[in-house]
Amino acid sequence: MARITGNKGEWSELYVLIYLLAHGKLNAADGKLNKLRDIFFPVLKVFREDVKGEKVEYRLPDPADKRVITIFLNNEQICEISQSDMEREQKALYWSIVNGAGKAFSIDGIEQVMSDLHCSKIKAVNTDKADIVLQLHDINTGYSPICGFSIKSDLGSAPTLLNAGKTTNF
């Protein structure tokens, strides 16, 4: 696998994936984006499609279970990884992003983690409107909707609501 580089915002997309796999929950936030520790949605599944036609699904364990995440490729189980391994990788990745120098940088050892996760890219495919797709469980209603989320990172420069580029046209 070639050396992967990205900016802090791009690395943050991979960080969010690993964080959610490690902790199995998505916390709510207040109007100022402060984390509400006691209000969260359990994450049941995370979905990615880095390569067209290759749908990767991460099924998170019930909190009472053995803390093992099951990975499926096109609905076929391919491997398992432990949440404790993801927790360790999440902490290391966080500090690598915070300490990353330059506009784009690489992170030592990340290729193996990505290979273990069957992840070939650090960020979502540009054609997707959502950066990450999750199946959450709403403990208040009992529903388990599939929701897409956009990821905006505060680890580098302040995030913008609009990513200006060649296709941005007013």
Task: Label the model's feature ranges.
Residues 103-129:
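Short N-terminal edge-element motif at the start of the domain
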